[in-house]
């Protein structure tokens, strides 16, 4: 005997999907237009409510467990959605986009892994560090060109030698660290 899914609303069901994952709960809804089941997986009077939406094409086995509820108030039960602060969501989204753009600016395009590592090490110490093509520019005064060795550090403006010794030390230590890491990677 075949039973319409709409007639089983409110029943406890056990669904096994094609990956043999079993979900138990109350059948909350069946949508024939997009061929999905919504199963309420939380216990009665538990808040917040948890639901699983399962595409019927992924169902391997569906079993109604338990007897027919004597009083099926489930069809009339309405779960009120939680309040969502839209302004807060928009603010978090904007902050996330800004952080993502900032992170993207810190990634060199077409540079070697060593070059990116050197950039990251300099940026940790000196925040005013940026990529210009494949060159690392620090404080708009110092440039480090590929292959990003100490001898590739150039002063852009005469008289701005104050920060060059610090940058040379950072680059030197970074290369030492890279060489140590390469030694550990050996197979």
Curated annotation (Swiss-Prot):
Q: Which Pfam families match?
A: AD, LSM12_LSM
GO BP, sorted A to Z: RNA metabolic process
Q: Where in the cell is it found?
A: Cytoplasm; Nucleus
**Positions of the AD domain:** 82-179
GO terms for MF: RNA binding
Report domain Sm positions: 1-68
GO cellular component term, pick one: cytoplasm
Which InterPro entries did the record assign? Answer: AD, Lsm12-like, LSM12_ABD, LSM12_LSM, RNA-processing_Lsm12, Sm
Q: Which residues carry this modification: N-acetylserine?
A: 2
Keyword list, A-Z:
Acetylation, Cytoplasm, Nucleus
Q: Check the record and name the PANTHER family matching this protein.
A: LSM12 HOMOLOG
The entry's protein name is Protein LSM12
Per the UniProt record, the source organism is: Saccharomyces cerevisiae (strain ATCC 204508 / S288c) (Baker's yeast)
The lineage, from the top, is: Eukaryota, Fungi, Dikarya, Ascomycota, Saccharomycotina
């Amino acid at each position: 005997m075949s039973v319409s899914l709409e007639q089983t609303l409110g029943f406890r069901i056990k669904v096994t999907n094609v990956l043999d994952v079993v979900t138990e709960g109350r059948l909350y809804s069946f949508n024939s237009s997009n061929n999905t089941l919504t199963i309420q997986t939380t216990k009665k009077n538990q808040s917040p409510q948890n639901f699983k939406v399962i595409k019927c094409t992924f169902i391997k086995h569906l079993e109604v467990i338990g007897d027919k509820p004597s009083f099926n108030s489930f069809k009339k039960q309405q779960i009120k959605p939680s309040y969502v602060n839209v302004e807060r969501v928009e603010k978090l989204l904007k902050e996330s986009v800004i952080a993502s753009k900032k992170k993207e600016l810190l990634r060199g395009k077409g540079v070697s892994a060593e070059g990116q590592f050197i950039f990251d090490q300099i940026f940790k110490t000196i925040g005013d560090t940026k990529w210009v093509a494949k060159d690392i520019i620090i404080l708009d005064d110092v440039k480090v060109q590929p292959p990003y060795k100490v001898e590739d550090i150039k002063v852009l403006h005469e008289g701005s030698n104050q920060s060059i010794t610090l940058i040379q030390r950072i680059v030197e230590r970074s290369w030492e660290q890279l060489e140590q890491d390469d030694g550990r990677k050996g197979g």
